[in-house]
Amino acid sequence: MPNKLIIFDTTLRDGEQSPGASMTRDEKVRIAKVLEKMQVDVIEAGFAIASVGDFEAVQTVANVVQDSIICSLSRALDKDIDCAGEALKGANASRIHTFIATSDIHMKMKLQMTPDQVVEQAVRAVKRAKRYTNDVEFSPEDAGRSDEDFLCRIIEATINAGATTINIPDTVGYNIPHQFGVTIKSLIGRVPNSDKAIFSAHCHNDLGLAVANSLSAVLNGARQVECTINGLGERAGNTSLEELVMAVRTRQDIFDCDTDINATHILSASRLVSSVTGFIVQPNKAIVGANAFAHEAGIHQDGVIKYRETYEIMRAEDVGWNANQLVLGKHSGRNAFKVRLAELGVEFNNEEGLNDAFRRFKELADKKHEIFDEDLQALVSETQTEAYEAIKLVSLKVCTETGEKNTATVVLSIDDKEQTATANTSGAVDATFIAISSLTGIKINLQLYSVSNVTQGTDALGEVNVRLECNGRIVNGQGVDTDIITASAKAYVHGLNKVLAATNKAQHPQI
């Protein structure tokens, strides 16, 4: 493609830094596979030195994904770079992304280093990273608040050292579009060897301007944008991949570049990330929200019926919405089930996983007349999640009576041993959670509890999301069922398993 715009997805690294959005290794692999199908150019799989879990996630994604460049973040430290290089050994194509802070406040207060020392360390880091891969990215952290003369100096030095991508982060989301675009254009114009590297933008959404700032960067010469599915990320989030990609593609009259992204997988990627992290997509979210292509006003409806382009600037099916989706039911066979999952971008590593998902599908079909794509994705997500859980919900019995306390009896399998507990309290969900907690012995603080319907109708699957805090660690749990209390129990158990898996998890840096 002439004048290609590179898409660098950091959902698995920066996106995971959203409180409660921590992902297991297997969940990261599932998301990475969808990103690969979307033809994402670079997947930042994690921060290898942060923990054993992060190292294994980067290593596994590097071994599984073949068609995207796999990247690991590292500070400008020898130990970080060596760890990243080791984790990326199995990658078909790899990149090391190293960074150091360049703003006055960061250099003085955090690093306690002089500008000369910072340049020296950045150059040394790039040269060390080149031992492992020819594809090295350098980021001057907090570039948005850094002195431009110093930025030019350190960028020139790191390009001379071998950096092939220079990423300019607006770490705290402080810039506005015109300002950020001018910065990108100025840096490209002032750095003597800028033609030897691709310039990139990494914007945060603290002022709601991440996508706008990134687009401004593209208009001013950036040819890589770092983004996340659903705009997931620290604080207010990052540049939304789906919004960035479709803005560039829809406004080809303004942008003289395009991406290789297969946009038909955007919706399935959005739903998978939402399901894994528990961060529900707001209905009015651009591109992937439930109302993104809905028209209620009579004049709008009439216009769309007569000629779609009167009120729609994109086709819904281009990003994965299927107006003529196949509705499955109790009489649908295994092949139709498998074919539909494939169309949704869902794959299983073995027949056992497919068989388990099909069994759950049949169980749901006995309770629900029509099963839609959203139901299938929820079922598959639950199937793939439970395969590696140490705590499993065996059964739940709840007794309720108006004006009386509710009783919940829970049977859990903990390390393959069944245990039973009963709790009595004013609420059925509360009683269920108390009974579960009494069996696990894990002290949990419930920070968030939300319920939503996966599809329409009184027989719809209910999706419950919980956010749990344990010893300062925040995780999300998700469960689906036609019964809300059962879905709540599944979500709570899912969260507890994440708590167990998240021990010794290190804190990630901000860029």
UniProtKB/Swiss-Prot annotation:
Gene3D superfamilies: 3.30.160.270, Aldolase class I (3.20.20.70). HAMAP family: LeuA_type1. NCBIfam families: leuA_bact, PRK00915.1-3, PRK00915.1-4. Its cofactor is Mn(2+). SUPFAM superfamilies: 2-isopropylmalate synthase LeuA, allosteric (dimerisation) domain, Aldolase. Keywords: Amino-acid biosynthesis, Branched-chain amino acid biosynthesis, Cytoplasm, Leucine biosynthesis, Manganese, Metal-binding, Transferase. It catalyses: 3-methyl-2-oxobutanoate + acetyl-CoA + H2O = (2S)-2-isopropylmalate + CoA + H(+). Signal peptide: none annotated. Catalyzes the condensation of the acetyl group of acetyl-CoA with 3-methyl-2-oxobutanoate (2-ketoisovalerate) to form 3-carboxy-3-hydroxy-4-methylpentanoate (2-isopropylmalate). One of its GO terms (biological process) is L-leucine biosynthetic process. PROSITE patterns: AIPM_HOMOCIT_SYNTH_1, AIPM_HOMOCIT_SYNTH_2, PYR_CT. Pfam families: HCS_D2, HMGL-like, LeuA_dimer. Mn(2+) binds at D14, H202, H204, N238. Pathway: Amino-acid biosynthesis; L-leucine biosynthesis; L-leucine from 3-methyl-2-oxobutanoate: step 1/4. This is 2-isopropylmalate synthase. GO terms for molecular function: 2-isopropylmalate synthase activity; acetyl-CoA C-acetyltransferase activity; manganese ion binding. Its EC number is 2.3.3.13. InterPro entries: 2-IPM_HCS-like, 2-isopropylmalate_synth_dimer, AIPM/Hcit_synth_CS, Aldolase_TIM, LeuA/HCS_post-cat, LeuA_allosteric_dom_sf, LeuA_bact_synth, PYR_CT. Belongs to the alpha-IPM synthase/homocitrate synthase family. LeuA type 1 subfamily. It is found in: Cytoplasm. Residues 392-511 are annotated as: Regulatory domain. Residues 5-267 form the Pyruvate carboxyltransferase domain. GO terms for cellular component: cytosol. Homodimer.
